[in-house]
Amino acid sequence: MTFADRLPRRLMLLGSGELGKEFAIAAQRLGNTVIAVDRYAHAPAMQVADASAVISMLDGEALEAVVQEFQPDLIIPEIEAIRTEKLQEFEDRGLTVIPTARATHFTMNRDRIRDLAAQQLGLRTARYAYASCFEELQTVAAAIGYPNVIKPVMSSSGKGQSIIQQPDQLQAAWDYAIAGSRGDSQKVILEEFIPFELEITLLTIRQWQGPTLFCPPIGHRQERGDYQESWQPAPLRPDLLAQAQAIAAQVTEALGGAGLFGVEFFVTPDEVIFSELSPRPHDTGMVTLISQNLNEFELHLRAVLGLPIPAIELLGPSASRVILAEDSGDRPSYAGVAAALQEPWVDLRLFGKPDMRPQRRMGVALARDESVEAARAKADRAASQVTIQPS
């Protein structure tokens, strides 16, 4: 399948955050029409899109109406909060969902993707179990042991995740997970805590025609289950990199379709352990905006349209550092931008979100240098210069 025989194409983004904004810009550079859909007005991708719509994407009827109105060539999910059953219905009617409706459904439900990896494909993952009530959580926690990690089966951006050291923390973790769940889900996954040396994202590109491709591995650090900084290339032994690539190829092949996938791993001294997967550009991959000849958004676009990807080249050691809001309010303004940009090989992305709240990601600093350590320090300096205030 290819959509590159005739451009432009009409691309509908379901989710219009900062990742969708960068994808929309990449799509428009090749003349495509972008329709940005999200649950709130003035979302980042809406600011650059050709058209937009504000709906609840958990509402199947609202999804039907917006697809009927705009008649997209491709439907491209960008977030988790979508009625994925409706995507399958669209696909059954001949519409193209990226990468596939099945892949979107599996990866937006942690139980589906974990069972696919561990049970169907036989891949090494953390030991895990599910719980649908607090009493069941107590039982599986005792079986798997402590420390452990509790996550909602359906959530995004680290919402509802906790690391549990002892049984008296379970009730608070259960309450936090249910509060962070998407939709009406009352199910959590509890998994053993892996004492990893490094967490990495392997950006994996499936093409309609052609081999599966990989970007150099990206290391990242998280707090509260959400990414704070990433760097590329991550230090990884050749044998462990080969393991990660083989696992990523196997999982993405099982999901099918075309596009860029963010495949996450825990790295220990002896192995890489599959963690999670996103069937779209990944937040830790924003570092590729400065690190690669083709960033993750351009790679995703080329893959879904069936355009060639002759080479993926690392331009130099690079890093990203998030810029977080500290306060709440509307119409945020940014100070310190000039100071942040005073060093060479530094760039910023300020997302243009219409409101702010504590710990909300409002921008990212990007840096390149002679080493990963220097790039990380430079990105951190740049991010620290930027302050955000409500108008």
Curated annotation (Swiss-Prot):
InterPro entries: ATP-grasp (IPR011761), ATP-grasp_carboxylate-amine (IPR003135), ATP_grasp_subdomain_1 (IPR013815), PreATP-grasp_dom_sf (IPR016185), PurT (IPR005862), PurT/PurK_preATP-grasp (IPR054350), PurT_C (IPR048740), Rudment_hybrid_motif (IPR011054). It is an enzyme of class 6 (ligase). Pfam families: ATP-grasp (PF02222), PurT_C (PF21244), RS_preATP-grasp-like (PF22660). Its EC number is 6.3.1.21. Mg(2+) binds at E264, E276. Coiled coil: none annotated. Keywords: ATP-binding, Ligase, Magnesium, Metal-binding, Nucleotide-binding, Purine biosynthesis. ATP binds at R110, K151, S156, S157, G158, K159, G160, Q161, E191, E192, F193, I194, E199. Pathway: Purine metabolism; IMP biosynthesis via de novo pathway; N(2)-formyl-N(1)-(5-phospho-D-ribosyl)glycinamide from N(1)-(5-phospho-D-ribosyl)glycinamide (formate route): step 1/1. Residues 115-305 form the ATP-grasp domain. The keyword Glycoprotein does not apply. One of its GO terms (molecular function) is phosphoribosylglycinamide formyltransferase 2 activity. GO terms for cellular component: cytosol. One of its GO terms (biological process) is 'de novo' IMP biosynthetic process. It catalyses: N(1)-(5-phospho-beta-D-ribosyl)glycinamide + formate + ATP = N(2)-formyl-N(1)-(5-phospho-beta-D-ribosyl)glycinamide + ADP + phosphate + H(+). N(1)-(5-phospho-beta-D-ribosyl)glycinamide binds at E18, L19, E78, D283, K353, R360, R361. Homodimer. Belongs to the PurK/PurT family. Involved in the de novo purine biosynthesis. Catalyzes the transfer of formate to 5-phospho-ribosyl-glycinamide (GAR), producing 5-phospho-ribosyl-N-formylglycinamide (FGAR). Formate is provided by PurU via hydrolysis of 10-formyl-tetrahydrofolate. This is Formate-dependent phosphoribosylglycinamide formyltransferase. It comes from Synechococcus elongatus (strain ATCC 33912 / PCC 7942 / FACHB-805) (Anacystis nidulans R2).
